[in-house]
């Protein structure tokens, strides 16, 4: 289906096609009861049940709201930023392994603001460090490694020299939990949770049920959590690892700061919705008139086929 709109000297063409579920290599989907614990050292596995990449946009209930641009102006978007319950561990073996279960008591845990880096937030007034050490390096990774093509095969838990920061805190793990409720006017819609930035790997649970995992710390991770929700109070748990196999590709000239460092939010869409949008502008040979081609992918998450949807 193609539609052409004329606005002044700008010609806009909208092309709509159905979404074909062809996941990128490394993205897997399915019902998994629990993680194996090896996902953060498995380069062939990029994500479980994470949405395929798409343009960054938000659902709005009305054109007037959309013109305000920011997602806070949509009733179908809800921020989860703020205080989360938090536990810090110096290595994976020391983490609280069952914290995601809703009956697990986290009342004595500290609160940490999201977004933030736990290394920075943990710096005390006297200069002591409650949640590990901020580490700066240039190109290298912060864990023991060798400069060779297949070095990633050795993983991130190798024993470094004793004077390295990661000798004592081998691979820090942050356990995050908080409660939330779904607005009543979201009934019948698909609900997603989005993590805009988590360094460098995390597992996700909703109401004690394992949802999936994500790598690639600088890109948004979206998960459809509709099947895991319940009426009233819901609980989200995220287990964040400082280092993972993805860290080999994220070795930049910067401080290495683990944590949930960008916004976390919920959003909802109708069963039939735009999954992705690609806008391509162009000018004619005289640079006088312009064209804008918008390719849109629509997706139907309903159990029945939809015809002539508008």
Name these PLM-found stretches.
Residues 1-6:
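Bacterial N-terminal signal peptides that target proteins for export
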Residues 7-15:
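Bacterial N-terminal signal peptides
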Residues 16-20:
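Sec/Tat signal peptide C-region and signal peptidase I cleavage site
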Residues 21-155, 235-243, 266:
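Accessory carbohydrate-binding/adhesion or oligomerization-edge regions at the termini
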Residues 23-48, 66, 70-71, 85-89, ...:
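Accessory beta-strand-rich segments of carbohydrate-active enzymes
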Residues 206, 289-310:
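Beta-strand-rich binding/interaction modules
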Residues 278-285:
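Short beta-strand segments of immunoglobulin-like
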